[in-house]
Amino acid sequence: RLCIPYIIPC
């Protein structure tokens, strides 16, 4: 799954 720090947590 996509993870983007501060936007989409892992």
Swiss-Prot record:
Keywords: Amphibian defense peptide, Disulfide bond, Growth factor, Secreted, Vasoactive, Vasodilator. It is found in: Secreted. One of its GO terms (biological process) is defense response. Disulfide bonds join C3-C10. Its main location: secreted. The keyword Secreted applies. Expressed by the skin glands. GO terms for molecular function: growth factor activity. The keyword Hydrolase does not apply. GO terms for cellular component: extracellular region. Induces mouse splenocyte proliferation and guinea pig smooth muscle contraction through binding to CCK-BR. This is Signiferin-1.
